[in-house]
Every structure is written in structure tokens, then in C-alpha cells.
Amino acid sequence: MSETAYTPRLRAEYDQSIRSKLTEEFGYANVMQVPRLDKVVLNMGVGEAVNDRKKAEQAAADLGLIAGQKPIITFSRMAISTFKLRENQPIGCKVTLRKAKMYEFIDRLITVALPRVRDFRGLNPKSFDGRGNYSLGIKEHIIFPEIDFDKMGETWGMDITVCTTAKTDDEARALLTAFNFPFRQ
């Protein structure tokens, strides 16, 4: 019995059309020079977790539903008295997505989640870091269809960082635009 490997829609699109389009646009000599998606990091900072550890666990459970992968709870590295924060207290959670889960998450983000954001006018084109990575913030995590609005207690924001192998911001912008990221004009 032959086993067929599952290929996400965006990965197949990258292999079939996006890679050749970027090669023409930037004139790469080698296929390995063409920028590609490396990883996606989802981070949820939960300030209320300082007083109540269950908040960090609830946020981690929600992030696990969104990502389809178990997140890790992040802890403070030093004590800050103005925030009533001690060392090694839970302050949030994060998860790193790679390969198929990364492509599936980006597909859901672009096609389902971002259109559900209130007053969405496009992504900020200035949020590149100078090395080909893109970061965006989301104010409410309830835009993802995996979160049940009725059972949810609180809304948290989250940071999404898309890491690419691009050397410059222009290459990364061309790559993400080819993946249909809705940048503002």
C-alpha cells in the first residue's frame, strides 16, 4: 500500500509558482537562494498571570487550540517591583510552528482570522525588522475559529512573528505578498 504525504495548500503553491516568480523577480542563480518561510512564533503575554497562575494556563490552552500544538509557559527572568513581579513567575506562553503546521496556520490566518478583525484595513508594511522577518500584533485572540466565543472567559492579545530566510525586507515583502498577506498600500 502506498502512503501519500500530505502537502499544505500554501506549500504546494510555493513550490509550483511562488518560487519561480521570486527567482525571476530577484534573479537568483540557485534555487536555495530563494527566500522561504522558516517558522512562525506565536506569543501571548498575560499580565494578569502575575496574580493568578490559572490565567497563564487558560491562555496556554487557548494558544494550543489556535496553533494545534502544545505551547510552553514563559516565566519572568528577573524581579520588577513596580509590576509586583518576582523571578520565575508565569507571565505568558509561546509556541513555535514549523513545516506543515506553519503553512496551515498561515493559511487560516490570512483566509479566516484577519478578515474577522474589526476595522481591518490591512497589515502595516513597516513591521519588518530589517532582516526579513515580519511581526504583527492581534488585539483579540477570538478572531480564530478554534476559540469558542461562548466558553471563553477573557480576551488576550497575541504577537505573531513570521521568520523567513530572506536577507532583506524587500525580498520578505515580495514573499509574503505572494502568499497573499494583505498589506496596506
Curated annotation (Swiss-Prot):
GO terms for biological process: translation. InterPro entries: Ribosomal_uL5 (IPR002132), Ribosomal_uL5_bac-type (IPR020930), Ribosomal_uL5_C (IPR031309), Ribosomal_uL5_CS (IPR020929), Ribosomal_uL5_dom_sf (IPR022803), Ribosomal_uL5_N (IPR031310). It comes from the Bacteria. Keywords: Ribonucleoprotein, Ribosomal protein, RNA-binding, rRNA-binding, tRNA-binding. Pfam families: Ribosomal_L5, Ribosomal_L5_C. One of its GO terms (molecular function) is rRNA binding. One of its GO terms (cellular component) is ribosome. Gene3D superfamilies: 3.30.1440.10. This is one of the proteins that bind and probably mediate the attachment of the 5S RNA into the large ribosomal subunit, where it forms part of the central protuberance. In the 70S ribosome it contacts protein S13 of the 30S subunit (bridge B1b), connecting the 2 subunits; this bridge is implicated in subunit movement. Contacts the P site tRNA; the 5S rRNA and some of its associated proteins might help stabilize positioning of ribosome-bound tRNAs. Part of the 50S ribosomal subunit; part of the 5S rRNA/L5/L18/L25 subcomplex. Contacts the 5S rRNA and the P site tRNA. Forms a bridge to the 30S subunit in the 70S ribosome. Belongs to the universal ribosomal protein uL5 family. This is Large ribosomal subunit protein uL5. It comes from Rhodopseudomonas palustris (strain BisA53).
